[in-house]
Amino acid sequence: MVPLTFLRTKASRSLPIMLAALIFAGCGTQAPDQTAAHMQGSAQADSGFYLQQMSQSSNDTKTNWQLLAIRALLNEGKTQQAVDLYNQLPQELNNTQRGEQSLLAAELKIAQKEYPAAKKLLADIDTKALENNQQARYWQAVIAAEQGRPSLPLLRALIAQEPLLSGADKQKNIDTTWQALSSMTPEQSQALVINADENVLQGWLDLQQMWFNNRSDPKMLKAGITDWQTRYPQNPGAKMLPTQLVNVQNFQPASVSKIALLLPLNGQAAVFGRTIQQGFEAAKNGTTAVAGNAVPAQAAQAANVNDVISPSAVETSDLTSAQAPAQGTMQNPVTAPTTPPATTQAPAETAAPAEAQTPVVPQAAPATDAATAQPQTTTPDQQPAAQPQAVAATTANPGAELKIYDTSSQPLDQVLAQVQKDGASIVVGPLLKNNVEELMKSNTSLNVLALNQPEQVQNRANICYFALSPEDEARDAARHIHEQGKQAPLLLTPRSALGDRVATAFAQEWQQLGGNIVLQQKFGSTSELRAGVNGGSGIALTGSPVSASLPQQQGVTIGGLTIPAPPTDAQISGGGKVDAAYIVATPEEIAFIKPMIAMRNGSQSGVTLYASSRSAQGTAGPDFRLEMDGLQYSEIPMLAGSNPALMQQALSSVRNDYSLARLYAMGVDAWALANHFTQMRQVPGFELNGNTGDLTATQDCVINRKLSWLKYQQGQIVPAS
């Protein structure tokens, strides 16, 4: 029998162990506060997780989960849900929670695109009281509030944020810093005033100045980057170069000794292809006189014939499919001609171009049929003419081998195979959009300057896209109108696919610039417009939001069921909201539209009117110019007066058809772009002052054109700025 004293001793020894077990078991039933790791950013989850934790918690822990849920909803783009949850925050918050609340308030304003309000909230936040991850978010909010516009506050925010980041986020910060610097003009840079102790910023500005001085010379730019890294070894950009400058260091110029020009030379699109060909050859060969017309007389005269679509009324991007080849199509590539056949002499009534003291861009002979094509030769008396003043000059090169391939006579894959077999070093073209789509599917390794854009641009290291399209012009219009401080644009477009494409392109660019909703109003035929004038109805400055400009509202999910967000009010009245109207119309259409706007809204409506080059065809008489008083419209620099000699040559060769003259200028610029293909592809900020616009390239190597803007003023046409 075990003694009783032993049992008592054993029991007394076991009691503390049992009590401890009970205590620990009790602790296990209450989950530890997990919010700290999430608040500090070391742990992350989606809004659903945070909302669930919030519903199961209380007091400060519940508030922490609520703050985390708001942040997650913002990151997921669910702005309205984030606002609703933010408004439910309790009044009593501790210091840490209040700091997070202040930061979220600014982030919410940015998500709602209320940038001035966001800046005011950010200015009231003490950054020293924030945790490191909150400081990174704070500076990101400051960056976002600047809307990508290069400025001193933006640069300072990026520099302050950089030490708080690592890995890919740090590289993104450095790339964004360089993007801001490289998008400045020298004048903007010189206007910056910095403090003496801002050493990092001073280093960045010295890099920017070196880039300004050498961006047109890749060799000098490479040497300048190396020298800058030596002088500023501690600068973040010296330790981790911006991606664009890494590409500069790897720069290798592409050969343009053997060029393949891919164009439709038969069918409906032939008039476009031959005009571009003539402009391209003009720049290549350095000839100084127009030897003939790029298009048959009947095509150029179509603008004056009723019920016939003139080339001036058709956009190149509208020609999305090749036409059936006519008799005598080119089945083989032809060599660029120098003399026209006897059967293609210019009619007697065609005016010869006036002589210019210094032709700005050389002019080539016209295209010929395959049967009469002769090898390219250059006579000794043909001197290269002077080129337009540009950031990077492009000289004529008659010795370069040029072969022209007809994309309307055979499938594109066969054309590309022949081009590859012929050993071309660069391809210029194709022109038709469907051919560009086929080009993307081919995965060719050749360097290609496509003369149109596919629906979905793909970033290919060997492809650049150069389009002369209404969408391209609409994007430039969005930038111009935004630069003029306008905030609420209305688009007046044809009731057609063209009008919808223009509206989408404008709205997408407007969104990227930080703009709000874009309105669109569609108009019908000329007869409908005439009836509107006769009826005295006028045009109200109202419209429906373009879908591409609407913020994506997230639905609400309750119990597994997603309820769509309520629709946005489709009709928004002018009432002082619309401050700009962009009109895409022919001269005849705009002659009705502008008076109808004044009829309905008065001449002092305060709305600035803008128009595309579609309304400018060189036929504006004094009455038309007076009627259009105050209207701004875009035009390529050549037709805006920057290159009078080339303008005269181009218009003479296409019988004064302004749309074809623009394509002629496109051919001239295509030669310049082909000669600077690698620079456009690899050197950040590389720019050509072309005849179709100031040419720069996006990261996808889509060539942007900054157009000239003109204005009707008291019967005269003057620069808009």
From Swiss-Prot:
Residues 1-26 form the signal peptide. Its main location: membrane. It is a lipid-anchor. The keyword Protein biosynthesis does not apply. Keywords: Cell outer membrane, Cell shape, Lipoprotein, Membrane, Palmitate, Peptidoglycan synthesis, Signal. The keyword Glycosyltransferase does not apply. Residues 316-330 have a biased composition (Polar residues). Residues 331-393 have a biased composition (Low complexity). It comes from the Bacteria. One of its GO terms (cellular component) is periplasmic side of cell outer membrane. One of its GO terms (molecular function) is enzyme regulator activity. GO terms for biological process: peptidoglycan biosynthetic process; regulation of cell shape. It holds the Pfam family LppC. A lipid is attached at residue 27 (N-palmitoyl cysteine). Residues 316-393 are annotated as: Disordered. A lipid is attached at residue 27 (S-diacylglycerol cysteine). SUPFAM superfamilies: Periplasmic binding protein-like I. HAMAP family: LpoA. Belongs to the LpoA family. Interacts with PBP1a. Regulator of peptidoglycan synthesis that is essential for the function of penicillin-binding protein 1A (PBP1a). This is Penicillin-binding protein activator LpoA. It comes from Enterobacter sp. (strain 638). The gene is lpoA.
